[in-house]
Amino acid sequence: MAHKKAGGSSRNGRDSESKRLGVKKFGGEAVIAGNIIVRQRGTKWHAGANVGLGKDHTIFALTAGNVDFRTKANGRVYVSVMPKAEAAE
């Protein structure tokens, strides 16, 4: 009897799509209003001045300027947008 036993089916072989999280605009980079600065799950980075926080914790620019990352005394990293200085008249 030259028979083979039935092979077992694999229960692995799946993976989820990557979510492309992380910093999209780094410190010192120029942004305009609406630009996404950070995509994250939870608040690894916190919203500072001139940025908004989306319902999925995305941090985005509210004004044009340069991105600034600051660590405060409480250990939290705050992301802000420093507006560009207006030309003196």
From Swiss-Prot:
Homology family: Belongs to the bacterial ribosomal protein bL27 family.
Source organism: Sinorhizobium fredii (strain NBRC 101917 / NGR234)
Entry-linked PANTHER family: LARGE RIBOSOMAL SUBUNIT PROTEIN BL27M, RIBOSOMAL PROTEIN L27
GO terms assigned for molecular function: structural constituent of ribosome
Lineage of the species this protein comes from: Bacteria, Pseudomonadati, Pseudomonadota, Alphaproteobacteria, Hyphomicrobiales
UniProt name for this protein: Large ribosomal subunit protein bL27
InterPro entries (alphabetical): Ribosomal_bL27 (IPR001684), Ribosomal_bL27_CS (IPR018261)
Keyword Methyltransferase: no
UniProt cross-references to Gene3D superfamilies, sorted A to Z: 2.40.50.100
Stretches for region Disordered: 1-21
Residue ranges crossing the lipid bilayer per the database entry: none
SUPFAM superfamilies (alphabetical): Ribosomal L27 protein-like
GO annotation, biological process: translation
Gene Ontology CC, one term: cytosolic large ribosomal subunit
Keyword terms of this UniProt record: Ribonucleoprotein, Ribosomal protein
